[in-house]
Amino acid sequence: MGICVSKPSPEPDLHNHHTSIPVNDTSLPPQDNSIPPKDIAIPAQDNNKPPGKKSPFLPFYSPSPAHFLFSKKSPAVGSPAAGSSNSTPKRLFPFPPPSPAKHIKAAWARRHGSVKPNEAAIPENNEVDGGAGLDKSFGFSKKFGSKFEVGEEVGRGHFGYTCRAKFKKGEFKGQDVAVKVIPKAKMTTAIAIEDVRREVKILRALTGHNNLVQFYDAFEDHTNVYVVMELCEGGELLDRILSRGGKYTEDDAKAVMIQILNVVAFCHLQGVVHRDLKPENFLFKSKDEDSQLKAIDFGLSDYVKPDERLNDIVGSAYYVAPEVLHRSYSTEADVWSIGVISYILLCGSRPFWARTESGIFRAVLKANLSFDEPPWPSVSSEAKDFVKRLLNKDPRKRMTAAQALCHSWIKNSNDIKFPLDILVFKLMKVYMRSSPLRKAALRALSKTLTVDELFYLKEQFVLLEPTKNGTISLENIKQALMRNSTDAMKDSRVLDLLVSLNALQYRRMDFEEFCAAALSVHQLEALDRWEQHARCAYDLFEKDGNRAIMIEELASELGLGPSIPVHAVLHDWIRHTDGKLSFLGYVKLLHGVSTRAIAKAQ
């Protein structure tokens, strides 16, 4: 696991860009961001535990940092400043030290019940200190001993240890598995207990995907919880990267990215955000070069609804998304982490680097990607565009995992399957509730899309299995969701999604309207040719859709209430010559009225 700062605020402040970064922290001069033998984990250290045996191929092994590689002390506050946080750091230093930020250590320790006196943090309102009085009964089967023969301990983490084991009987008799053993004595807070309960629930719900480590069952007794998983003996993705000299060829990187994107798109469709994606959390099933890749370690994962935002800071420093640090994020944060992995695969270095966690966070928030240093000049323009669109700091402009599989760099690979994208239904919901004027504006914009830009929308439309006359209805969406959902999602999320699209119950939608409904304006805005798209779309809108409109009528179409100063907000949306929408008004209509614009007008 990575960092965990669990102090969510009721109302996340999107404008506070330094929530987790001590303002007086500084970093070193430009250093090497090349990937070291092991990534830096940031949990609090437990000095009373013996070091675990190294086992890089088990799903739950969480290695401690290699202390012999790093200096013992963090740099003092006020140490020499780092290179500019506005550009990707250069690669001049062989490895970064683990130096955890103190506030993160304290929060991790508090979450898992091992706070040291000098690191104690203020308990959250609903948090219980100590293990006394906590209900540590999970309702799991108590027959672990009768079903499994336990082998040697092969790894020890901060919250448990891992053993090899074998099935004693049944259809899997003699099969090796990995067993994560979590001592109940370690569960000294209500949060820690809930973490275990949620992890098992998520593993049980997601099991079955080819690129996800298989979950067999969970057991418990008076002292431990036992989570039985598939044994993966091919090693970590990180180890494969290092064995190849630090980077992959483009073709080999594509093969890895397709598997990662497939499983993450699957998780997101089921309403699960992983929150700790990194090379260490992907294992190969076997040592074969073409072995399947498996996602592991759902200890920080959580459920998230389509319109919900999470606000607790979790993950691993090098892979954490900017919006996580802003305490307002969703599934897009996983895509950022995939972008970091793709950057590492293609060049062997991390895109954001500093000597401390707070320095890394500052780089994540402020640094701009650079593709000037070797080997980037020799990397294809499609691959660089792929990485850029995953590492866009604005989560609204970032590709989804399903969209990334439709990117020109990847989409022509062999045996690729395009998954259903939850974003389509979120955008359709907004479209169905939009005014006729905004729908006309979106239809004009959709007519400017290129063949490559239409590819993703065509694949999504095909997955909805339209009728022979090329239309879809609510029933098509229902059947598509049922085909692509786990049993857990069928029971919980499908109905909610269908209710939000209830307007399609009484009408049908053709592909042309679907493109307008499922089009992301923000993602188009991230493209270099956005200005061209917008100008062409406005010309089309002028011919078919634009009309004279009063500010009051426009405010009504946009759903602005009487308390909003509509003339101050919308005065530049309308041309004074003929009362029609201006180009600026058209572009703003595509986005809708922002709360920032309203606040500024007030």
UniProtKB/Swiss-Prot annotation:
SUPFAM superfamilies the record matches: EF-hand, Protein kinase-like (PK-like)
Catalytic activity: L-seryl-[protein] + ATP = O-phospho-L-seryl-[protein] + ADP + H(+); L-threonyl-[protein] + ATP = O-phospho-L-threonyl-[protein] + ADP + H(+)
EC number: 2.7.11.1
Parts forming coiled coils: none
Gene3D superfamilies, per the entry: EF-hand, Phosphorylase Kinase, domain 1, Transferase(Phosphotransferase) domain 1
UniProt-annotated stretches for the region Disordered: 1-59
Keywords for this protein: ATP-binding, Kinase, Nucleotide-binding, Repeat, Serine/threonine-protein kinase, Transferase
Biased composition annotated in UniProt, kind: Polar residues: 19-34
Residue intervals of the Protein kinase domain: 148-410
Domain EF-hand: 451-486, 487-527, 528-563, 564-602
UniProt-annotated catalytic positions: D276
The Sequence repeat ranges on this chain: 20-26, 27-33, 34-40
Enzymatic class: transferase
InterPro entries: CDPK_Ser/Thr_kinases (IPR050205), EF-hand-dom_pair (IPR011992), Kinase-like_dom_sf (IPR011009), Prot_kinase_dom (IPR000719), Protein_kinase_ATP_BS (IPR017441), Ser/Thr_kinase_AS (IPR008271)
Protein name: CDPK-related protein kinase
Species in which this protein is naturally found: Daucus carota (Wild carrot)
